[in-house]
């Protein structure tokens, strides 16, 4: 079980070929982060394998995997897209699209046979690439006058958030990103600085 502020995904494309009773299943695991990317990749594979009987798929998006969909593309309901999505879930992955292309071999596989074949093809494609862990991060924006710069940067150095954006002038601004589980401590330290600076520091939570 993953920690609440960690998710697993892939960064490379994986491929696999699964054969069952002369039907060939070509499976592709693709890293994606947006619905537009998903649509583009589906279109690419539909055009590339225009002569295939079925181009089925499933995807899961978002750091918490809260956006997902599966498609049977003409196969009996629940025999293709759902087993593919099930493999994405079983490996606790998100931000991934799996496409399985089927070339019919002349022998019907039946409902259970299709489920097994699509599940196996998807699993092999997902297992063909490394699974990596990423953290779910939160951001804060700090606004302050220049005399506070050293104090602000000292906390940055000690807590090690990632500095996303910075402006150092008479009026300064920094935008910091940090793993969610560590963000409260960072905010707490800056809230103490708000008090000691007599409200010269403003904190905006994003």
Sequence positions of predicted segments:
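C-terminal regulatory domains involved in ligand/effector binding and gene-expression control
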Residues: 1-78, 201-206
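Short glycine-/aliphatic-rich beta-strand segments at the starts of folded cytosolic domains
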Residues: 130-146, 174-176
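Conserved mixed alpha/beta catalytic, RNA-binding, or beta-rich assembly cores of soluble enzyme
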Residues: 77-90, 101, 114-118
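Short amphipathic alpha-helix segments
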Residues: 143-161
